[in-house]
């Protein structure tokens, strides 16, 4: 079963978010996985804290991490995720790989 994420009153499949949204991982890691074995993820921010009135993710000024956005939906569904994304030695990559591994193979 694929994790469902509640967004604006409706539940959306995790792989649909990968396919259609370009979201900062820190915004939805807590809802997608519930917890993480990686210590860096403990500093995650809830999605509501990142969203402004225009629903655009807003990071606090004191955030030092260089956060990147990825849209892996089509690539993941074709089993053709770019190597530089999966091999990038950062906690965002580890979260990404963890989330993809936690999703059911049928959904991807």
Curated annotation (Swiss-Prot):
Intrachain S-S bonds: none
Keywords of the record: Apoptosis, Cytoplasm, Mitochondrion
A single Gene Ontology biological process assigned to it is:
positive regulation of apoptotic process
**Renumbered ranges of motif BH3-like:** 5-12
Give an example GO cellular component term for this record: mitochondrion
Q: Mainly resides where?
A: cytoplasm
**Superkingdom of source:** Eukaryota
Cell compartments where the protein resides? Cytoplasm; Mitochondrion
Where in the body, by tissue, does this protein show up? Answer: Ubiquitously expressed.
Q: Which residues cross the membrane?
A: none
Function in brief: Functions as a proapoptotic molecule through the caspase-dependent mitochondrial pathway of cell death.
Q: What is this protein called?
A: BH3-like motif-containing cell death inducer
What's the encoding gene here? Answer: BLID
